[in-house]
Amino acid sequence: MGKIIGIDLGTTNSCVSVLVGGVAKIIENAEGERTTPSIIAYTEGETLVGQPAKRQSVTNPQNTLFAIKRLIGRRYEDEEVQRDIKIMPYKIVKADNGDAWVEAHGNKMAPPQISAEVLKKMKKTAEDYLGEKVTGAVITVPAYFNDAQRQATKDAGRIAGLEVKRIINEPTAAAFAYGVDSSKGDSVIAVYDLGGGTFDISIIEIDEVDGEKTFEVLSTNGDTHLGGEDFDNRLINFLVAEFKTQQGFDLTNDPLAMQRVKEAAEKAKIELSSAQQTDINLPYITADQSGPKHLNIKITRAKLESLVEDMVKSTLEPLRIALKDADLSVADIDDVILVGGQTRMPLVQKLVTEFFGKEARKDVNPDEAVAMGAAIQGAVLSGEKTDVLLLDVTPLSLGIETMGGVLTKVIDKNTTIPTKQSQTFSTAEDNQSAVTIHILQGERKRATDNKSLGQFNLEGIRKASRGTPQIEVTFDMDADGILHVSAQDKDTKQEQKITIKSSSGLSEEEVEKMVNDAEANAEADKKFEEVVKARNQADAIVHTTRKQIEEAGDALPADEKEKIEAALKELDEATKGEDKDIIEAKTTAVAEASEKLMEIVQQKAQAAEAGGEEQPKEKTKEEDDIVDAEFEEVKKDDKK
């Protein structure tokens, strides 16, 4: 079996890792960075991913997509999506099936399709490093992701050409990265994960027996719509309000200006983790009849903390719930691990330290731990690593809607997965021959207050008085946290099954189409890369040849020069086209036409070298200046 890579598909940044020599290694991307911005931009005929996409975001805000993870597996009408619609520079639209999709260059796209672009870059980064094709991956998701969001992430992997071997929770992956090589023995750790768009807390027990470590997740909690992007937005809103007060201008109607403010806010937030204050200076942010307007605002760390303090404090309640669900107290926690870039904020560290009564460990890289843990899980699945066992949990309860519109739970939250559990239900009316099984995920008592995952009908039930038929409903959750449900009439043995998939909003046909499109685009991308490479080689030979023509001077016969110029002209025309073979052929033609030229240049170089040994030493520049000065009379009046 080939290498199974680990991918942290983040809201703001993504990261890829692989096990090398028994140790998880972060792989640098083509730009030489260890993390890649989860940003995708669509320009005329080209898709940019990562840093290149981020660099052009100011001039192309409507077609530059970021924080797509906040939309993955969500419905358009969701409260969180409606909030994002108001603040995102790109267009969020309602798909035919009611899901939240995005629109760029007039094309409507599903979030898994866009996330697949980031995953493709991660896949290529790993392939370039390993020198072999990669097909298997472990992808991480926030622990509090529901079934729809997990399935959508899995679909994104498929579209990217990856076989997703396992979906693993981010805090669990971070615990792997911390605990696999730790010599501490048995311990209970709290993983506080505040990333770009999501927040999770997981309580994890690490047991070691005869050198084999078991990682058991005791409980998990969180908020799938809270993270660094929200912190950025608080600062953006403050800056826009301040500018309006100072200049009387509302920047919210100017997408280009807002993108500049967003970039500056993100940068300022990062700077304020190490500095007490910073200046946000954006010249020419807008203009009116009186001239250009500049944004120049000083931000202190205290001001930023006052803007976001309520959000940081809101993460403490999930900590209390997670401890309660694990039946533990703060005193039972041996170590605290911080994961996610937003945990670099001093206020976050301060509140977490106060809550747990101990400082978080500093030996875990918050940006890289999750990908490294995913790579370790990949090595476990491939058989490369055998001394580790992971016991993860389902983050939310699962059940069905029963009489009166109530959620009746079949699998409780924080149940170790994989798991299979059954309950027996009956009919609500006399002579009822069919029942609808409505599957729900959540913690609320009222069925409609929970996430609907799907429904199916069980027909052919033997007619009898209400409460007599026995219908066994079985919930089977796999290791990825994806659900399979079956219902059987115990009397007639009539059975119906459903796998809760397509919760991502994509049918099997749509996913297949996107997979095929991605493969076709991969071929187009490869051709584009080859054409660019051929153009670069052509530019290089044109530059060299022009330089050699100058060096040869009159020594180059006129007919030879004409021949070379004609070849250069043909090459210039070829580089304007998209045919790699023609560009390469014309490049070769220039090289062949320049053979005589190269001989002349070489002869001149050799002659100069030989002559240099016999000729007296050349005057230095200083000597030249002295001699020239003898012929120059500079009058005092002429001096300026």
UniProtKB/Swiss-Prot annotation:
Residues 602-640 are annotated as: Disordered. SUPFAM superfamilies: Actin-like ATPase domain, Heat shock protein 70kD (HSP70), peptide-binding domain. It comes from the Bacteria. The modification Phosphothreonine is found at residue 198. The keyword Chaperone applies. The keyword Signal does not apply. One of its GO terms (molecular function) is unfolded protein binding. Gene3D superfamilies: 1.20.1270.10, 3.30.420.40, Actin, Chain A, domain 4 (3.90.640.10), Substrate Binding Domain Of DNAk, Chain A, domain 1 (2.60.34.10). It holds the Pfam family HSP70. PANTHER family: HEAT SHOCK PROTEIN 70KDA (PTHR19375). Acts as a chaperone. NCBIfam families: PRK00290.1 (NF001413), PRK05183.1 (NF003520), prok_dnaK (TIGR02350). This is Chaperone protein DnaK. It comes from Psychromonas ingrahamii (strain DSM 17664 / CCUG 51855 / 37). The gene is dnaK.
